[in-house]
Every structure is written in structure tokens, then in C-alpha cells.
Design a protein with these regions (language model features):
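Positively charged n-region of N-terminal signal peptides that target proteins for export
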Residues: 1-9
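Sec-dependent signal peptide cleavage junction
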Residues: 17-29
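Extended ligand-binding regions for polar small-molecule ligands
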Residues: 26, 86-141, 184, 188-193, ...
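Acidic, polar ligand-binding/catalytic clefts
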Residues: 27, 31, 70-89, 98, ...
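Extracytoplasmic small-molecule ligand-binding "clamshell" domains
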Residues: 27-29, 37-44, 49-53, 62, ...
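Short loop->beta-strand "edge-of-pocket" segments that line small-molecule binding or catalytic clefts
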Residues: 30-31, 156-165, 180, 267-288
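Solvent-exposed, polar/charged alpha-helical surfaces in well-ordered, non-transmembrane soluble domains
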Residues: 45-53, 64-68, 101, 105-113, ...
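Sec/Tat-exported extracytoplasmic proteins
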Residues: 55, 60-63, 70-74, 111-118, ...
Length: 292
């Protein structure tokens, strides 16, 4: 019942919204779902900072991140997730270059092999038990891939992973190297598995990227993988080689606790979401939710 209410509410927002985003033509306005203004930032964490400063009314971000910051850190006493409002249901995947199927197949193989061990242990350590979706009987759709991408990675001696700061996925950066995070520890476990299984000596390197430029970094071989809470979409799957899904996620609305009463029922959400200044990360799934 909760899911039905949420989906109906989102549909109502889409149908009845008064579209007035700044700087857009009438034709462009009609492609937006809700809000009176849309502001784009470099990261999801930036949207929370702007929310805490009252520069925006609503932050649309990943539930994985929202759940963490609503309980932990500088914003825990200020922000809250709007109950029962799921704007999109998604899964995370790891993206390689479109033709690097053999390489991504090895990533799949390792993820599946670790499903009942390190994967669960790391997920529990970061409070993500309910978001885990891998099983040890998950089928690797790329198992028969025989291109040269894996051999090229082995020859290079390293796997370069593009990241942004995104707790509990990737955080606590020391000398530009992330030291904590679900994806960080999982990536290290995957590389350790591959080293042992194939008697290779791959090192994992992490490179801070601009999320809005992630596809370019991947195509230009600045990085080998986008492994940072990447939502699987049809468009991304058509342009990149994406792993099996490894984490469930939702797009949710985060507001100040002091304003939470404005979003306490469907009617209030409908009115106040449509009159709100919305903040999103550039190039994110949250932005796509607002732009549909």
C-alpha cells in the first residue's frame, strides 16, 4: 500500500505541477515534474550543505546517502527524509567502457563469488543490509566475453576507479585517497579476489572525478571503472558496459526537520513540492527524476 501511495503521489505531482524553472522556455518547462526552481550542484553532499543553509527547500538524492547523513555527521540534527515519498526505485552498477566486456565479466565474477562473504560483511559494516541485492546464484551475463580488455588491465598492473565523496559509499579522504566507504572496501575485496584467483598483481587506484564528466573520463581512459553508486539506466547501459546490479537504491526528498510538517501528508507534499526550490547533483539520477 505504501508503494502504491508513493507512486500515485509522484504521478499527481507530475500532472499538476506549476512549472516555472528559471531560464527555461515554456516548451522546456513542460519536461519538468515539480518545483518552482531547479539548482544543480557538483555533488549530492553540496545539495545537503545548501539545504542546511536554507538556500534550497528540497534536496533530491540517493536514499543510500540520505539515510547515512540523516543519522550521522554535521547535518543529522537538521535534515530529514520525507516519509513514504519514493521518487524512483533503482539499482547501482559498476561501469566500464562499452567494449570492455571481458574486464567487466571479471568484476561480475568476483562480486558473485563474494556475495555470501565479504559483500555481506562490508554491507553490514555500513548499515546497508536492506540495500544488498547480490546472491551467489546471480548469473554473469558476460561470462563468455573474450575480448582483450582483461588482458590489457592485467598488463597495466592497476585498476583506476573514478569516485566522488558520497558517504557511506566513499568518504574520509586522506591525501586524495578515500579511506572509508562501502564501494571502497568492496572494490578492494574484488581486486584481492581477482589477484588470488588469476595469480595477478593488480593495484587499485582511486581518482576523484567530476560526476557530470564521468562518461568522458571513462571513454578517454582517465579511469577504468565508474564505481561510485552509479544508477543503472537504459541510456547508460547502451553506452557503457555495466556490471550486475550490486545495491538497491531509491531517489528520495530530503528537507529541513523544521519544515518536515509541510510534507506530512499527500496533499501538503503536492503543494509544497511544487512551490519548492529543488537542489540536485549535476548528471545524477536525482536530476533525471526532476527532469523527466
Amino acid at each position: 500500500m505504501k508503494k502504491i501511495i508513493t507512486l500515485l503521489l509522484v504521478a499527481l505531482i507530475a500532472v499538476t505541477a506549476c512549472f516555472s524553472f528559471a531560464g527555461c522556455s515554456k516548451e522546456e518547462d513542460e519536461s519538468y515534474k515539480f518545483g518552482k526552481e531547479l539548482l544543480r550542484y557538483d555533488s549530492q553532499l553540496d545539495t545537503l550543505a545548501k539545504l542546511a543553509a536554507s538556500d534550497i527547500d528540497v534536496s533530491i538524492i540517493d536514499s543510500v546517502m540520505a539515510g547515512y547523513y540523516a543519522k550521522t555527521g554535521d547535518y543529522a540534527n537538521q535534515i530529514a527524509i520525507v516519509d513514504d515519498l519514493i521518487l524512483a526505485q533503482e539499482k547501482y552498477g559498476i561501469a566500464g567502457r562499452k567494449n570492455d566486456k571481458a574486464f567487466v565479466s571479471k568484476i561480475n565474477e568476483a562480486l558473485i563469488a563474494l556475495a555470501d562473504s565479504e559483500y555481506e560483511t562490508i554491507g553490514s559494516a555500513y548499515g546497508l543490509e536492506e540495500s544488498l541485492c547480490l546472491e551467489n546464484d546471480t548469473v554473469n551475463p558476460l561470462a563468455s566475453a573474450d575480448d582483450n580488455s582483461w588482458n590489457e588491465i592485467v598488463s597495466s598492473g592497476k585498476i583506476v576507479i573514478g569516485y566522488t565523496i558520497f558517504a557511506p559509499i566513499c568518504y574520509d579522504i586522506v591525501d586524495e585517497v578515500p579511506t572509508k566507504g562501502f564501494d571502497i572496501e568492496l572494490a578492494k575485496a574484488v581486486v584481492a579476489y581477482l589477484n588470488a584467483k588469476y595469480n595477478v598483481n593488480l593495484q587499485v587506484e582511486f581518482l576523484l572525478i567530476d560526476w557530470d564528466n564521468k562518461e568522458v573520463d571513462l571513454a578517454q581512459k582517465n579511469i577504468d571503472l565508474i564505481w561510485n553508486g552509479l544508477t543503472i539506466t537504459e541510456e547508460r547501459a547502451a553506452n557503457m558496459c555495466i556490471s550486475v546490479p550490486y545495491l538497491n537504491n531509491n531517489q528520495v526528498a530530503v528537507v529541513l526537520k523544521s519544515n518536515l510538517s509541510k510534507y506530512s501528508d499527500a496533499a501538503k507534499i503536492l503543494v509544497n513540492m511544487n512551490s519548492a526550490i529543488i537542489g540536485v547533483e549535476k548528471g545524477s539520477a536525482g536530476e533525471s527524476v526532476v527532469l523527466k
